[in-house]
Amino acid sequence: MAQVQAQSLPTITPESPPRLEVRRISKRFGGLQALKDVNLTHEGGILGLIGPNGAGKTTLFNIISGFLKPTEGVVIFDGQTIHKRRPHQIVELGIARTFQIVKPFGDMTVRENTISGLGMPIYPRWQALVQRYRTPDTLHASDAIMALTDLTAWAETRADSLPIGLQRRLEIARALATGPRLLLLDEPAAGLTASEAEELAQLIRTLNAQGISIIVIEHNMTFAMGLCHRIVVLAQGEIIAQGSPDQVRHDERVINAYLGQEDADA
């Protein structure tokens, strides 16, 4: 196993954030066109990816993180083509991801879940090896990550006994343990109260201030508009609008495609 460094988070100067390029990405599932000619660049800051259900947001995340291969197009991260790589290889390059459905290792403590993230690039089935690698280095690194994510008080608590707000923090802690330069967050505010969502938003801002680029999929428009520096809107697999939160909020295409659906569902 590669030696785990006590300093687990990357040191990135504001002048050199990682660059993600999505070039002409399309994805078809049989006759269904999930993504069509999507072009996207993200370099630093917090980017929000919003859109109605079925717009292709999670499909795009799955392609960036290696869980799906595109039908057409390429994904480039800091000059390296990554769209043909496996998920653990993409983690090794510095891209980590959380999922909308929270899946901590329920029979393990918060600390053990965090340590599992430290081994993710090398051992995809790390949970079976956690006890073996409870070393001073991993314990020190997990302490730092739990302090950053405000989970120290629950270090020895089983993950499956945590409320949803703390489980979402734990998902981020596990992702941080891999030392990401780019963090993909899929619906991080889902199921949270307004106060819990604001606390989580503050954590995300802190991570970004430390040099981690972040892309957030979010259905909560208030959360996304208050958090993100730039918003990209997907509808029917295509980007229909992008810009600052204020620009997107007043874009008729967004109102018709996204807010209109919310009104119809109300």
Regions found by a protein language model. Give the residues of each.
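Glycine-rich phosphate-binding loops of nucleotide-dependent enzymes
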Residues: 2-266
